[in-house]
């Protein structure tokens, strides 16, 4: 599991559209699709239901989202702590 995949997953969960998610992560739609498919393969479950012009989180996607968000937040806090010598705020 890669940080980029988690970030793309979280953005797609917000946008519910592959094209808009690709724009937000500064890549092409096919890369977003590939990252999500790889993440789904690693987790062994589908995270999104793909519809004609949008996607919806599956039950598994809803369960996974808070963990992905927490992982990204923890990584960013760790990055700041190392880069700037500060401790993360909060519990």
Where are these regions (language model features)?
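A short LG(V/I)-centered, amphipathic sequence patch enriched
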Residues: 40-57
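Core residues of bacterial helix-turn-helix
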Residues: 24-25, 43, 64
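Short helix-boundary/capping micro-motifs
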Residues: 12-28
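A short, exposed helix-loop element centered on a Lys and neighboring polar residues
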Residues: 75-83
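The N-cap/first-turn positions of alpha helices
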Residues: 2-8, 29, 61, 68
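Interdomain hinge and pocket-entrance segments immediately C-terminal to HTH DNA-binding domains
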Residues: 84-91
């Amino acid at each position: 599991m890669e940080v980029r995949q988690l970030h793309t997953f979280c953005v797609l969960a917000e946008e519910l559209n592959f094209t808009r998610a690709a724009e937000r992560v500064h890549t092409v739609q096919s890369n977003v699709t590939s990252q999500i498919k790889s993440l789904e393969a690693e987790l062994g479950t589908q995270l999104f239901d793909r519809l004609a012009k949008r996607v919806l989180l599956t039950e598994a996607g809803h369960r996974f989202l808070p963990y992905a968000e927490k992982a990204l937040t923890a990584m960013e806090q760790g990055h700041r702590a190392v880069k700037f010598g500060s401790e993360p705020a909060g519990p």
